[in-house]
Structures are given as C-alpha cells and as structure tokens.
Amino acid sequence: MARDYPLERYRNFGIMAHIDAGKTTCSERILYYTGKSHNIGEVHDGAATMDWMEQEQERGITITSAATTTFWERTENGTEPDSEKHRLNIIDTPGHVDFTIEVERSLAVLDGAVCVLDANAGVEPQTETVWRQADRYKVPRMVFVNKMDKIGADFFNCVRMIEDRTGARAVPVGIPIGAETELEGLIDLVTMEEWLWQGEDLGASWIKAPIRDSLNDMALEWRAKMIEAAVEMDDDAMENYLMDGAEPDVPTLRALLRKGTLAMAFVPVLGGSAFKNKGVQPLLNAVIDYLPSPLDVVDYMGFKPGDETETRNIPRRADDDMAFSGLAFKIMNDPFVGSLTFVRIYSGQLRKGDNMINSTKQNNERVGRMMMMHSNNREEIDEAFAGDIIALGGLKNTTTGDTLCDKSDPVVLETMTFPEPVIEIAVEPKTKADQEKMAMALQRLSAEDPSFRVETDIESGQTIMRGMGELHLDILVDRMKREFKVEANIGAPQVAYRETIGHEVEHTYTHKKQSGGSGQYAEVKLLITPTEPGEGYSFESKIVGGAVPKEYIPGVEKGIKSVMDSGPLAGFPVIDFKVQLLDGKFHDVDSSVLAFEIAGRMGMREGMRKAGAKLLEPIMKVEVITPEDYTGGIIGDLTSRRGQVQGQDTRGNAIAIDAFVPLANMFGYINTLRSMSSGRAQFTMQFDHYEPVPQNISDEIQAKYA
C-alpha cells in the first residue's frame, strides 16, 4: 500500500511557549477547526484534549508533550479549499521550567515550531529558554501573538521584544485589527486584505474585505518591511524591487517568505486570540505556507553503532525506499494499552510485525501494535512511512532517545543529553503491599522521564527521587498515587549538594597488610588538581618504566572513582577534578589489583582533605515578575535568601527582577511571594551553576550529615 499523503504535504511542528501564554488553547482550536475534536476543550474547565493526564487538567498546565495527527485544507475564504489536504503532526510542549526536558525531547524530532506569546507579557523567561533550545536544534519557527483580547495586549511591543530578547528578525505577515475587547480580525499583509470574523459560530466563518482607509498607511508601512525581508532571499526579486519598485506577486512573495523562514533568516509573526477563536485559521494557513515539510530538512546524519568517535557519516532522509530508521522520543503509560513509545520515522517504512533493532542498546524489538495518536485517542494502523510520528505498543527495552532501525543497515541517530537533577526527596512505602507497587511505579516513571532519577541511599537504604524542581517531584508523587495506587510517605525536599577541591596537592599513600602468608602491598603517588566548573573528572597515568605494572593501573582508577560518589566532607558526589598517577611501588608477591584499588581509594580520601575539600551548592537563576508596588519588598526578601540581584527591567506594566539564589533558600518561595504580592507576582527558576557554600553554612551541613 502506498502512502496517502506525499511528503511535501506533511508538517511536523511543535507549539512552544511560556507557561500560560495559551499554548494548549491554541492546539485545542487547531484540533477543532481541523475537525479532529468536536467540542472545544477549555484549559480552565479542565477539559482540554491535549492535556490528558488528570494533574494537567487540574493544574491547567501541560506536563507531557502529547503528539497528535490532524489534517488541514488551506483556505482563504473559509468555504472552499485552495490546496489539497495537508497532514499536520502537532506536538504540544510544556511551558513550565521544571519540564524543559520534555521540550528538549520534542524539539529533537520536529521540523518546525510555532512559538506562542502572550500579547501582554511578550517574550517571557521560559520563552527565551525554549527559543535557545530550538536554535540549538536549528528548528525554523514562526510566532503567534496570542491573547490579543486581553487588557494591555500590544502586538507591536511583542514584535520589538522578539528582536530584543531572542536576537531574531521578526517579520509580521498578519497584523491584528484592534486589541482587547475591540479585536475584530486581522490584516493579511501578503494579500493586503482584512479578515473579519463573523458572528458567534466559534470563529469558523469570516469575510475578506479591502483594508479600511484608517489602517491603510500602517498596513503599507509594515508590508514594505515584510517585502524588504522577503526579497533579500532572491537576487532577481531584490533587483526588481530596488530598481523598479516592482513588488513580487502573492505566490512569489509566499515562496520568498517560506525560503527565509526555512533559512532562519527571519521569523513570520501573526496575532490573534485562540480563546476567542480569532486568527487560528490564518495561523494554520501560515503553517502550511512557511513551515518546513520533511523534504525541506537537511539529511539527518547518524553514526555507526559502536563507533566511539561518533563520526556522523550515515545519512538518513525522508525517503520511503531507504532503510528504516526512527527515534523514540517519548514513552507514555496509557491506561488501556500499557506502555506506548512515540517514534519519529526519519527514513524508510515500518509495518506491523516487523523486526527491528534498537541500535542504541543493541537489542532486538518487534513491532506489535502501531497507532496514530490523537492526543489520547488512538487509531490502529498497519504501516507507517518516513515523516510519520506514530506510537508503538509492546516495545520491551526501548527508552527515550533510543534509535530504532533496520537490522541490515543499522545507524544511531541521536544521543540526547539530559540535565542533572538538582533536588531530591526520600520516599517510603506506607505498607508492605505498597513496596512492590512503588518499585514498579518508579521504574515506569523513570523510563518515561530521563530527567527523573531514582536511587537508593547506600547508608540509610532509603529510596531517593531526584528531579528538576519542586513541581516536577510533586507531580511524580501525585502520579504514583493516582496511576499506580501507591501510598507513600514523602520526606522534605533536599538540595543536591556536591563537593570539590580547593587547590592542587600531591599525596603519596602506602597500603601494607601482613597477616601470615601473602600480604597486600601497593604504593601510589597522586597529583590531584581542581578543574574549571563543569569540566567533570579525568584520570591519567604518568607512569614510566613500570613503577606500577600496567595491569594494576585500572585498579588505582577504580579506587579513585569509588570516592567520587561519597566525598570526605559530608558524603556528597565529588565533581570537577582530575587525578594523575605520578609514581608508585609494587611487590612481586604481595601486590594485586585489589591492593592498588585500596591504595587509590585511601590516597584519594586523604589527598582530598589536604586539597581543601569544599562543599558546592546549586545556584538557581530566578526571575520574578511583579507589579511595581511590591518591587522593594521582593528584592529585600531575595537578598535575605542569600540572593544576588542582577538587575531589573520594565516589562509592560510590571517589573522583572533577575537574581541568582541558592536552591537551599528557595523552598516554598511561591507561598512567600504570593503573600507578599497579594498573589499578583509570579516567578520562574532554573538551575544555573554550582558555587561554594559559605563556611558557616558548610559547617552546619557537615554536622547534619556527619
């Protein structure tokens, strides 16, 4: 069977934004207008289709990126289509900082993105974070300025903010007519017409009209800016425009705007209000006009499984005749089907019952059930093609970031990097019956979410959950209760401290043990040096002339590494140092790998104490947005939390305060902030770097953990 839709009519795109900009509402409207969803789900009623976990519906935020497939016929007048049906695969990504990892995963498999802004707040901190992530994955994007019906909505201020904050060139292609309660429609700068929404049929019908006189000058001014950006994409068009003042016709103009968007030379901007159902159809048209199809994307370069240099020299592209390859970018537990693995197919075809290999883990997998997802409704399918985003049921060993491919032509597409967790809590099952359920729940949740780690504390035997923030762990604990029916006691959140060394030191350690028969003997001379923050650990042997035989050197490193998990001050992991093995002595009979391992371990422990071991704490980048009246109090409070205020600037009618604050002092901050600002201020924070802990606090922590 052949594919139903040619690749040029595919659009794989994500919807990304700051929390509360209206991302999920936009996705809902898209599903409504494209006929996938028969009633419109409202986030504030807890009924949005894309937010399908109970907690998402209760908290009104999106946690997991739901992938959904829908179809759109481009239309200018709302009644007859002017293009054939396009297939849209949409991924709704979370906007809360604790879930940046979800965004990271979905960006890896998208071709394009729509960035949704709040017309009042503009480019917010999380928008910048996501924008930078999208830059890293080279994802072409366009902007939809949402909530134009809100008080204080300002489209042109948003356009300025895009340029100031992200450095991208913003090119409006559609300008809202009116704002706040006066929002009537939008000016299409490409065709120079007004779109005016009619009546109360949820924005499904509109009329096109010539631009009214009062708006004509403004429209011409912005159209000229748009054309200038567009003609830069083609020498002939530019020459005609500059020499003869000849403007490109509508199809040429769209083609040039598309070329510039794909080259990331600029970002098309439109405005509207998803909640009021105004501006969603022009947005869908723009997705088709300007965002890439899988054919517009450069070849995805992978590397050969087992290649340690990871030389990316194996191309994969959207071609059905190539060998099959796909990337598993998300795992979800579906209450009815069990574990579902979301896969983006980069090349080739996949059929039900096919055998394939997981080249990341070198395991075989078999395709059991194959589904096309619509939020959380599923449609069983028998085959899928390059460019599709599908869900597979029944995969045994595949986790997020793994490559699935044809056995005869294996490739590894991606090695996703996931941030280290900065906050941890201890969990204990309430009853014996809960214990087994909890182990299964934690295993499933950590398979779904690589930024969540589960460890057992060696000394206390407690189970430790580690994550990216309070909200992240809150929701995971909540899911354990709901989805897996586990009752557990939760400890207070703890900070993930680290240890490092203050200065370089040379240390010799001799391990001698005589107890009748053959004894143990090993001597090592170590040079322990601090490295730059974030550089991590390295080991190097400088042994010449066999002072320590080759076969014993791995023992020394093993001993050194065993100290890294539990530093000398308070038992926290040790980071950012390097060790050189300078010299040593051995005994023909009494030396062994074990003896050198013990010497390495003890030498490292003593050496670290001599090297001025220091305790490090995670420092968070905090941004508080507050009405001006509360600024003084909030800055005072941040300073009292050992925060360093970096500056403040005006954001609309509010003030944004930037600061670095130790995580240890940020627990429960949301409650303090709410009471200080009568609930009007909000904040976001994300991990930035590690810094040494002041001595008096370090002493307290050491006493507590000793």
UniProtKB/Swiss-Prot annotation:
Localization of this protein: Cytoplasm
The keyword DNA-binding belongs to this UniProt entry's keyword annotation: no
Gene Ontology MF terms: GTP binding; GTPase activity; translation elongation factor activity
Record Gene3D superfamilies: 3.30.230.10, 3.30.70.240, Elongation Factor G (Translational Gtpase), domain 3, P-loop containing nucleotide triphosphate hydrolases, Translation factors
InterPro entries noted in UniProt: EF-G-like_DII (IPR053905), EFG_II (IPR041095), EFG_III (IPR009022), EFG_III/V (IPR035647), EFG_IV (IPR047872), EFG_V (IPR035649), EFG_V-like (IPR000640), G_TR_CS (IPR031157)
GO CC term, one of those recorded: cytoplasm
Alphabetically ordered keywords of this record: Cytoplasm, Elongation factor, GTP-binding, Nucleotide-binding, Protein biosynthesis
Binding site for GTP: 17-24, 92-96, 146-149
GO biological process: ribosome disassembly
Domain tr-type G: 8-295
Function: Catalyzes the GTP-dependent ribosomal translocation step during translation elongation. During this step, the ribosome changes from the pre-translocational (PRE) to the post-translocational (POST) state as the newly formed A-site-bound peptidyl-tRNA and P-site-bound deacylated tRNA move to the P and E sites, respectively. Catalyzes the coordinated movement of the two tRNA molecules, the mRNA and conformational changes in the ribosome.
Similarity-based family: Belongs to the TRAFAC class translation factor GTPase superfamily. Classic translation factor GTPase family. EF-G/EF-2 subfamily.
HAMAP family (alphabetical): EF_G_EF_2_B (MF_00054_B)
Name the record gives this protein: Elongation factor G
Encoding gene per record: fusA
